[in-house]
Amino acid sequence: MAIDENKQKALAAALGQIEKQFGKGSIMRLGEDRTMDVETISTGSLSLDIALGAGGLPMGRIVEIYGPESSGKTTLTLQVIAAAQREGKTCAFIDAEHALDPVYARKLGVDIDNLLCSQPDTGEQALEICDALARSGAVDVIVVDSVAALTPKAEIEGEIGDSHMGLAARMMSQAMRKLAGNLKQSNTLLIFINQIRMKIGVMFGNPETTTGGNALKFYASVRLDIRRIGAVKEGDNVVGSETRVKVVKNKIAAPFKQAEFQILYGEGINFYGELVDLGVKEKLIEKAGAWYSYNGDKIGQGKANAITWLKENPAAAKEIEKKVRELLLNNQDAKPDFVVDGNDAEETEQDF
């Protein structure tokens, strides 16, 4: 429908005034001069990248990863950092829990010599550091471990047993308002790790909630619920964890999908194991009995030997990964693979 000529002139004058006052690009039509595709960073897990629908975690956004203790939250974020560093990106780790192990981080592929690390004294200090790094425009990925450890200054200066009702929630709410715009402008990915708490007296529905108030739930573009669902064994020895991640919230693609993968102790996410499984599922790798073949050539008897072959032949592994991503990311159904039930999906209130 054609717009009235006088209205067009008035709109052009208004747009000109806005750009003059606030700078070029402060207002534009949605389809012009901007990329429609969201830039992403791999999570280190092929199945999780596919479940997210965009091939990884989105740049310029806030992401929340939460789950029980020892479920793989920090491991997953370290894998994201390793993937970002391989692309030449600068990363920072805000270690509010004071528990980052540099030896373990190096084993997961993190370049610790070029990883910025801060162990702040208070929650306000941690969030100010995040804001300063985002505003610099020089840092691509920031990880905060964890929201539960972001202690307000008033609580640290007070005594144990003092009541500080809603302080952490108020601090997080103010930080979200300030950070969201700066992150978008600098195209910085900010990942918050969070812990789970139980609400008392919940008879029906999910009693679980996350710390730090409700603001983070609203501002996060992606929320991931990570759980340990079993053990990976070699004989009688436990060598890793079977892990399930649910995409509880997703603003860049269809939500409520899930991914399952292995986290091996001292190695991280079993990427090549996922590659074999997805390759077989998509008929890129042929499986006959115990033998695995690729392009007509046998690559190993048993999954372990197939994984070893892929590790020794990175070019073939890269080729299979590219084909899997093209098949599964470009042809995603509108219907999610997995829908969490109402109890899991509901946004619950925060206990202070």
UniProtKB/Swiss-Prot annotation:
SMART domains: AAA. InterPro entries: AAA+_ATPase (IPR003593), DNA_recomb/repair_RecA (IPR013765), DNA_recomb/repair_RecA_CS (IPR020584), P-loop_NTPase (IPR027417), RecA-like_C (IPR049261), RecA-like_N (IPR049428), RecA_ATP-bd (IPR020588), RecA_C_sf (IPR023400). It is found in: Cytoplasm. SUPFAM superfamilies: P-loop containing nucleoside triphosphate hydrolases, RecA protein, C-terminal domain. Keywords: ATP-binding, Cytoplasm, DNA damage, DNA recombination, DNA repair, DNA-binding, Nucleotide-binding, SOS response. Its main location: cytoplasm. GO terms for cellular component: cytosol. It comes from the Bacteria. GO terms for biological process: DNA recombination; DNA repair; SOS response. GO terms for molecular function: ATP binding; ATP hydrolysis activity; ATP-dependent DNA damage sensor activity; damaged DNA binding; single-stranded DNA binding. ATP binds at G67, P68, E69, S70, S71, G72, K73, T74. NCBIfam families: tigrfam_recA. PANTHER family: MITOCHONDRIAL DNA REPAIR PROTEIN RECA HOMOLOG-RELATED, RECA. Belongs to the RecA family. Can catalyze the hydrolysis of ATP in the presence of single-stranded DNA, the ATP-dependent uptake of single-stranded DNA by duplex DNA, and the ATP-dependent hybridization of homologous single-stranded DNAs. It interacts with LexA causing its activation and leading to its autocatalytic cleavage. This is Protein RecA. The lineage of its organism: Bacteria, Pseudomonadati, Pseudomonadota, Gammaproteobacteria, Enterobacterales.
